[in-house]
Amino acid sequence: MSEKKNKKERLADEIEQEELNILDEAEEAVEEEATADTLTEEQAKILELENKLDEVENRYLRMQADFENVKKRHIADRDASQKYRSQSLAQDLLPALDSFEKALATTSDQEEVKQILKGMEMVYNQILIAFEKEGIEVIPAVGEQFDPNFHQAVMQDSDENAGSNEITAELQKGYKLKDRVIRPSMVKVNQ
C-alpha cells in the first residue's frame, strides 16, 4: 500500500507541478501581453511626441524665416526712406525754382535790375547745386526721344527738321531723384 500511496503522492505531485507550470506559463503570457501592450502604448506615445516635435520645429523654422523677411523688408524700407528723403522738399521747392527761371528769363537795360537778376541767378545756382548733392537732376528734354516715363506731352509739333517722336520744346522742366521721377517734363513733341 505504501507503494500505491507513493504512486498517488507522486502523481499528485506531478499533477500539482504541471498545474503550477501551466499557471506560470499563463502568468508569463499575461505579463508578455501586458508588456506588449505597454510597449505599443509607449511606442504610440513616442510617435505622437515625435510628430509634435516635428510640428514645433517646422513652426520655429517658419517663424525664423518670417522674422528674417521682416528684417530684410525693414532694411529695404529704411534704405528707400534714406534714398528718397529729400523728395518732399524738392517737390515743394520746384514751383519756386520755376519762378526763378521765369524771372531770370526777363531782360532789362537798367543797371539795378541787372544786379538783382545777377543775385537771383546766384541763388538759383545754389539751389541747383543743393539739388545735385541730393541726387536731384533735371530730366533732359529738347532733342531727346519722347519717353512717357519722363515726359508729359502737352502739345504736338510738325517740324520737318526734327525726327518722329522727338521733343522740340520744353514748356516746364522735369526733375528726378536718383531713379524716381519727381515731376515729368512738360514737352512739345514732333509728330
From Swiss-Prot:
The keyword Lipid biosynthesis does not apply. It comes from the Bacteria. Keywords: Chaperone, Cytoplasm, Stress response. GO terms for molecular function: adenyl-nucleotide exchange factor activity; protein homodimerization activity; protein-folding chaperone binding; unfolded protein binding. SUPFAM superfamilies: Coiled-coil domain of nucleotide exchange factor GrpE, Head domain of nucleotide exchange factor GrpE. It is found in: Cytoplasm. PROSITE patterns: GRPE. One of its GO terms (biological process) is protein folding. GO terms for cellular component: cytoplasm. The keyword Cytoplasm applies. Pfam families: GrpE. Its main location: cytoplasm. InterPro entries: GrpE (IPR000740), GrpE_coiled_coil (IPR013805), GrpE_head (IPR009012). Participates actively in the response to hyperosmotic and heat shock by preventing the aggregation of stress-denatured proteins, in association with DnaK and GrpE. It is the nucleotide exchange factor for DnaK and may function as a thermosensor. Unfolded proteins bind initially to DnaJ; upon interaction with the DnaJ-bound protein, DnaK hydrolyzes its bound ATP, resulting in the formation of a stable complex. GrpE releases ADP from DnaK; ATP binding to DnaK triggers the release of the substrate protein, thus completing the reaction cycle. Belongs to the GrpE family. Homodimer. This is Protein GrpE. It comes from Listeria monocytogenes serovar 1/2a (strain ATCC BAA-679 / EGD-e). The lineage of its organism: Bacteria, Bacillati, Bacillota, Bacilli, Bacillales. The gene is grpE.
